[in-house]
Amino acid sequence: MRAKRLVAAATAAVLAAGIVAIATPATAAVNICQAKNVKEAGGLDNLIKLAKKEGKLALITTPRSWANYGAIHDAYEKAFGVKVTVDNPDGSSQYEIDTMKTAPKSKQPDSIDIGPLVVAQLTPPGSKPLSSPYQVINWKDIPNAAKDSTGLWYGNYGGKLAIVYNATLSPTPTKASDFSKPEYKGFVGITGNPTSSNQAFMSVLAASIGNGGSKNLSDVTKGLELYKAVKAQAPLVSVNGTNLATGAAKLGFMWDFNALGIIPAAKAAGLDLRFAYPTDYVLQAPPYINAINVK
């Protein structure tokens, strides 16, 4: 099963790196089950050939509006003729980990995209890793702090938290403490459950720091207090692409790389969405993590 996961996911990583035109010489003997880089897989041409033969790439929790994944999926299908499927696009990082642990093989993803807060669960003490060691083609360009030395996981992309808001809001929100203002009652939201969603947790952390709290990940008291005050005024709205594009949500934190993709979609629907970095504190978190499933 590792061979199947590796072929599909490793080829996808090549495309994401923007270097699909590179070809590497094939080796004389290839054991794809043991390959830990493109050379050991028989070269890029062989890897692409095997991916085309498989014909599908199973992903999980990678919505089209997230980090330009929609365009990446389309480009992958066009370049290789491989069908991309995505399980639970709007799920959380914890959902991905839980799926790897408990889902039957037919429901297992080839590759995962998770927040750094759950990466330790890929290598549980005393148990076998949930991921396979593989060094993607641009491995040397990834900082050591953003990857496992053996290739069990690696950082792929990252960004800063921005305030996304509907231009109809007045006054214009500029910092986390603005969220509790009565002018924004019923419009403020969060991207998910902070206990399972990396983006949601980082939103609480940013709100905490912006309100004079600690920068320690283990103490987000000030942020929780802020969202509690907001919720006391009106229920929190889910800050996602659909709600922002329809006007159901008008204010919240979001990664800048996601805001950049949602704003054009909202414009097409006749809404003026904007984003700006908070004036009190700008949070840049560690990169999101990719890994190849071992199952």
What are these language model-derived features?
Residues V84-V86, V188, L273-F275:
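Generic structural signal for residues in well-ordered beta-strands
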Residues A41-K52, T62-K83:
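Short, polar/charged alpha-helical segment
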Residues G155-K160, G223-A229, P235, K267-N293:
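Periplasmic-binding protein-like
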Residues V118-T123, A245, L251-L271:
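A ligand-binding cleft/hinge motif common to bilobed small-molecule-binding domains
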Residues M1-A13:
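N-terminal export and membrane-targeting signals
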Residues A29-L57:
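Extracytoplasmic low-complexity, Pro/Thr/Ser/Ala/Gly-rich segments
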Residues A58-H73, D87-K101, K107-A249:
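Extracytoplasmic ligand-binding site segments that recognize negatively charged/polar headgroups
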Residues R2, G18-C33:
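C-terminal region of N-terminal signal peptides and the immediate post-cleavage residues
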